[in-house]
């Protein structure tokens, strides 16, 4: 089966809804998107692994590898989108539409369009004997729980030299990305007496020092 061109790939990806949400009534799987990517990447001689998420058989990550050895370059993105209300769109969100020199559709920018571009760029390497691999990685649930990325990170299977993430950044390459880290601090005081306050330790005062 011949590989579709970039716009045709984008059109097919956008036509498949893959909303992820913490609300079960609107949450969807991403397997159909993963299977599309897998079929195209196999045409380019990538070795493709589809990795179902634990307790979510309708969702999966994908790791596609071209070449051999250690290191290499990862092109990474997510296959899910945020929820959408079709009534708020000027165009059908599940149909790729070109208007005013722009492409409209659910996921054109964030971020199904990235996979069409990455696969198109990989065509020129499909018959190369590369000493370091090119990997294309697709994850699930980035827009909700990050379960896809969490499971992939926990597996420890990605040890590339470089990673490029195709999230939209206003057409300006950036070398960092925001994240989130949560920590908890516990302080325990000890009782004292007004006759000798030095015997005590006030946890409230200690927390004031930490926060301030």
Predicted regions and their residues:
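Histidine-centered active-site/metal-ligand motif
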Residues: 78, 177, 193-194
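Acidic/His- and Gly-rich active-site-bordering loop/insert found
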Residues: 1-104, 127-130
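Acidic-enriched catalytic cores of C-N bond-cleaving enzymes acting on peptides and small amides
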Residues: 194-212
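Glycine/serine-rich anion-binding loops at beta->alpha junctions
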Residues: 101-117, 193
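Acidic-glycine-rich active-site phosphate/pyrophosphate-binding loop
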Residues: 84-99, 160, 175-186
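Acidic/histidine-rich catalytic neighborhood of metal-dependent amide-processing enzymes
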Residues: 111-182
């Amino acid at each position: 089966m011949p590989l579709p061109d970039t716009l045709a790939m984008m059109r097919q990806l956008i036509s498949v809804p893959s909303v992820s949400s913490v609300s079960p009534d609107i949450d969807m799987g991403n397997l159909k998107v993963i299977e599309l990517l897998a079929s195209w990447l196999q045409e380019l001689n990538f070795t493709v692994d589809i990795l179902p998420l634990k307790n979510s058989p309708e969702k999966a990550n994908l790791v596609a590898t071209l070449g051999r050895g250690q290191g290499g370059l990862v092109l990474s993105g997510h296959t899910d989108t945020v929820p959408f209300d079709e009534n708020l769109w000027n165009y059908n969100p599940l149909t790729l539409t070109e208007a005013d020199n722009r492409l409209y559709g659910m996921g054109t920018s964030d971020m199904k369009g990235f996979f069409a571009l990455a696969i198109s760029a990989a065509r020129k390497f499909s018959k190369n004997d590369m000493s370091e691999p090119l990997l294309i990685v697709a994850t699930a649930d980035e827009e909700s729980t990050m379960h896809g990325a969490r499971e992939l990170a926990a597996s420890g299977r990605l040890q590339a030299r470089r990673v490029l993430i195709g999230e939209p950044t206003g057409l300006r390459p950036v070398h960092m990305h925001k994240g989130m880290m949560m920590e908890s601090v516990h302080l325990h005081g000890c009782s004292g007496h007004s006759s000798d306050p030095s015997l005590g330790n006030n946890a409230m005062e200690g927390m004031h020092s930490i926060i301030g």
